[in-house]
Amino acid sequence: MAFGYSPSYCSFWRTLLGLYCLFTLVHTVISTPPEDPVKCVSGNTNCIVTNSLGAFPDRSTCRAANVAYPTTEAELVSIVAAATKAGRKMRVTTRYSHSIPKLTCTDGNDGLFISTKFLNHTVQADAKAMTLTVESGVTLRQLIAEAAKVGLALPYAPYWWGVTVGGMMGTGAHGSSLWGKGSAVHDYVTEIRMVSPGSVNDGFAKIRVLSETTTPNEFNAAKVSLGVLGVISQVTFELQPMFKRSLKYVMRNDLDFNDEALTFGKKHEFADFVWLPSQGKVVYRMDDRVAVNTLGNGLYDFFPFRSQLSAVLATTRSSEETQETLRDAHGKCVTATTISSTLFSTSYGLTNNGITFTGYPVIGSQNRMMSSGSCLDGLEDKLTSACAWDSRVKGVFYHQTTFSIPLTQVKSFINDIKSLLKIDSKSLCGLELYYGILMRYVTSSPAYLGKETEAIDFDITYYRANDPLTPRLYEDFIEEIEQIALLKYNALPHWGKNRNLAFDGVIKKYKNAPAFLKVKESYDPNGLFSSEWTDQILGIKGNPTIVKDGCALEGLCICSDDAHCAPSKGYLCRPGKVYKEARVCTHVPK
């Protein structure tokens, strides 16, 4: 039976989808926890690794002959020594593997994955010195909880607590702030213990103890290491006395947002924005530190990080696939408005007492307000529910383009995006289906591969097709924004996110890159912890872009020929609409 796609039919399904979105955002159930990202054919041999989305940007399969699961630093030393002696390639994997690029991949099929899954212990908590030493496989959630036990707090961190200490150090993970030392987790680290390849005299493995006072050059290299210096075994954090935060969200139009973005971060310590460009709105996060004895027991359990019913996830994904197939821009905009208004009206998951939301401001202790991820907490329920992006169910599947624009250029960049919207106001509704454009403040860091200056980090998430050769609705608009950021404003891509093209020539953007590479050569002269991917992004050998038919559709290249898009489906390589130097895959009706 064939069904006509009438306006009333469209309206019905948009309404139904809106109800599904509402149910998904506010429903919390027991959730099947994510599976181990490493899977082996037999025991710990003949293994593959993937990321939390179930697919790397180029959709390749990363293999290794074995995986090792050390439980102590001594075991880690033994594992690294044996692999070094044998000349085997090694890469580190984590419990949840949330980095999108191929940072966990080793070369060929004969390498070794070293998982930090069981290096997840607290080594020492010193309330008097206000320090906490943990193993590198400790998750952010554990770190926050262990600090709170002794009355201490990590001041800034990512909003998702499923990342590990080693993963945060490897990719430069951060929260949002221009205050203090800034929002990067690695800038609150005082000591790093790392196991690197060693010489025969070292027994083929060497424990290195790094700090700002004793080994400043090596310490600044290790703070954002991409995993190429060795395996971090332990990290010591400098913490602060526990404090509370007072948070409220305010939605405004974006008419003066260009100017507000430059100054808002100076007014509020934990400020950020969610920009809804197609709706012409911005959600301002007014978030400040208050005394620990201030009344309030608030909790932030962010709705999109809660578990979701798999049936609801499948329906929502199917609806967006239909919108893509039918080029239903209006439908996407209606759904986006439903999602954003629902999130705002339900305070994004904030409650004043851990149960209900009664009004702003929400005041709570730092450990209850800074990060969340309750979809990780559940017991096995046979995938009746899961984290929204769990690849074992039909859920969200997306690209994530994330980059830092210097604060001095943010106004101009926002104006460029607004200029694109003037051409077609519906062009960015697809971003608002995925929360909108999250904007976080970052500052310059002494880490050699850390941020270079005060900046705003733009986090853009959008639909990814199951078929890599299927183009997206308004693909050209998002590609142009990506190229405006990277090429016009020389933006720095987030090491743990992004598509391949973002890393083309990236190492030239870091003034301390030569110093980093010098430490790398000293620590691992044979490149045992390096891979084809890390060599490409560090400018050592090769290029991260992949030029082939359809390569621009998945961000593997910037198109220079129609074949790099989808000419059979009407998508051709054309100049940008605002930034003429851009080359984007544009739908050209026949």
Curated annotation (Swiss-Prot):
Keywords: Ascorbate biosynthesis, FAD, Flavoprotein, Oxidoreductase, Signal. Pathway: Cofactor biosynthesis; L-ascorbate biosynthesis. InterPro entries: ALO_C (IPR007173), FAD-bd_PCMH (IPR016166), FAD-bd_PCMH-like_sf (IPR036318), FAD-bd_PCMH_sub1 (IPR016167), FAD-bd_PCMH_sub2 (IPR016169), FAD-linked_Oxidoreductases_BP (IPR050432), GULLO2-like_C (IPR055154), GULO_Plant (IPR010030). GO terms for molecular function: D-arabinono-1,4-lactone oxidase activity; FAD binding; L-gulonolactone oxidase activity. Residues 60-242 form the FAD-binding PCMH-type domain. It is an enzyme of class 1 (oxidoreductase). It catalyses: L-gulono-1,4-lactone + O2 = L-ascorbate + H2O2 + H(+). The keyword Oxidoreductase applies. GO terms for biological process: L-ascorbic acid biosynthetic process. SUPFAM superfamilies: FAD-binding/transporter-associated domain-like. Its cofactor is FAD. Its EC number is 1.1.3.8. Residues 1-31 form the signal peptide. The keyword Secreted does not apply. One of its GO terms (cellular component) is membrane. Catalyzes the oxidation of L-gulono-1,4-lactone to ascorbic acid. L-gulono-1,4-lactone is oxidized to hydrogen peroxide and L-xylo-hexulonolactone which spontaneously isomerizes to L-ascorbate. Belongs to the oxygen-dependent FAD-linked oxidoreductase family. This is L-gulonolactone oxidase 5. It comes from Arabidopsis thaliana.
